Design a protein with these regions (language model features):
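Extracytoplasmic ligand-binding site segments that recognize negatively charged/polar headgroups
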Residues: 36-49, 65-74, 87, 91-248
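Short beta-strand->loop
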Residues: 111-123, 143, 171, 275, ...
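Short, polar/charged alpha-helical segment
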Residues: 19-27, 34-61, 153
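Mature extracytoplasmic/periplasmic domains
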Residues: 292, 297, 301-367
Length: 395
């Protein structure tokens, strides 16, 4: 299932333990979970459900440490690594994926492999491309999945009865309706995924970028991407002179009628915001005919975490049927499962299958038949830097 890892950060003290011993060591530990804290539903799920449940079930005190950018946390761990601080680190668990995982792996900042030791890992389909590889980087047991995502476009059907069906149609719509479209500034993850969709649009084939990196070919497609983004900038909200800082700000722009579309990595987010009263019940979502980018998000344990056992217990609980069902509830978060529902017994399968479907949430079939892979993290990093240099500073 999980391939060998060249450089390991296995703690003999932890690695030699049975799972029962891990549970015993974890009891009484405090686990500090560093994660992006900008989405209220995620924060409510973690603090209102996960925190009390791991305390009740395992005696683990879990503390969410919200951050604006997990890259800053990675930088802190790197400094500790360079300073030789191999034990007693401040960070026990991280919500990461993509370029941050690549950075951690490249610099040997993660404990593990540990994912294959979690009892609930048997519920995960490790052969699924977005689980086996994180933005093109082999996971190799150094991360444990806890959710899946797919980009969707959000719109108010009362204002836009027939939304664009392709990226080309959306670009035409933007030019014809100046000031009515915005996307968050990269490296915000929703702004970044919009840029990657443009990249796929101008290059013509998402699958072609899954292989070996071609510098010349990338430069050609990237330059076309920046030119197109600069071309539409004057037609954006506030003439492209400023960009929303995050998806929450963009959601409020849509709710306030300042723009006509929003972007989300969570297909059920619009339904949740209708439930919470931010969006009217006429809001809906769509995906492009050519597809939208999907991925998996993970948790990882730093090499010098002070509470490795507790972090493993939390990671295992996050992929339990109970925790995954709660997270998938559109009235809680609506984040899609990281586990393979078909691996559950019929009772649990029925619970997942009878979850209420939010009014604005697309069917599983619609989403799954319109999935595009993430490009390798090398492309993501370069596109984000290029956007800043050529689009933002090139205004």
């Amino acid at each position: 299932m999980l391939t060998a890892v060249a450089a390991l950060n296995l703690s003999p003290r932890v690695n030699a333990l049975t799972w029962l011993q891990v549970l015993e060591r974890a009891r009484g530990q405090t686990v500090d979970w560093f994660m992006w804290g900008g989405f209220p539903s995620t924060n409510a799920y973690v603090n209102g459900y996960v925190v009390p449940r791991v305390k009740e079930l395992y005696g683990v005190k879990l503390r969410q440490v919200p951050v604006k950018d997990i890259a800053e946390v990675i930088s802190k761990i790197l400094v500790e690594k360079q300073a030789g601080k191999n034990e007693g680190g401040e960070i026990d668990l991280m919500w990461i994926n993509g370029e941050n995982f690549r950075t951690c792996k490249k610099n040997d900042l993660l404990y593990g492999p540990f994912a294959d030791r979690l009892p609930n890992q048997k519920l995960v389909d490790w052969t699924r491309p977005s689980v086996h590889n994180d933005f093109g980087e082999p996971v190799q047991g150094l991360e444990s999945p806890w959710g899946s995502a797919q980009a969707v476009m959000i719109y108010d059907s009362r204002r836009i009865p027939q939304p664009p069906q392709t990226m080309a149609e959306l670009l035409d719509w933007i030019r014809q309706h100046p000031g009515r479209f915005a996307y968050p500034a990269p490296p915000d993850f929703t702004g970044s995924v919009f840029v990657r969709h443009i990249f796929y649009h101008v290059s013509g084939d998402a699958a072609a970028w899954q292989g070996e990196f071609d510098e010349k070919r990338f430069d050609d497609a990237a330059n076309k991407t920046y030119l197109l983004l600069k071309d539409i900038a004057p037609s954006l909200w506030r003439q492209g002179m400023t960009y929303p800082e995050n998806p929450i700000r963009l959601a409020h722009l849509l709710a306030d009628g300042e723009v006509d579309f929003a972007i989300s990595y969570h297909p059920a987010e619009a339904s949740k915001m209708i439930h919470d009263g931010l969006y009217p019940d006429t809001v809906r979502t769509f995906v492009f005919k050519e597809g939208t980018i999907s991925n998996t998000h993970f948790v990882a344990i730093p090499f010098n975490a002070a509470a490795k056992e507790g972090a493993m217990v939390v990671a295992d609980f996050l992929i339990s049927p109970e925790a995954q069902l709660k997270k998938a509830d559109p009235e809680v978060w609506g984040d899609f499962p990281a586990i393979d529902i078909q691996r559950l017994d019929k009772t649990w399968q029925e619970k997942f299958n009878t979850l209420p479907r939010g009014i604005a949430t697309l069917s599983d079939k619609e989403l799954q038949t319109h999935q595009l892979p993430e490009p390798p993290s090398e492309i993501l990093i370069r596109l984000e830097k290029g956007w800043d240099e050529h689009v933002l500073k090139g205004r």
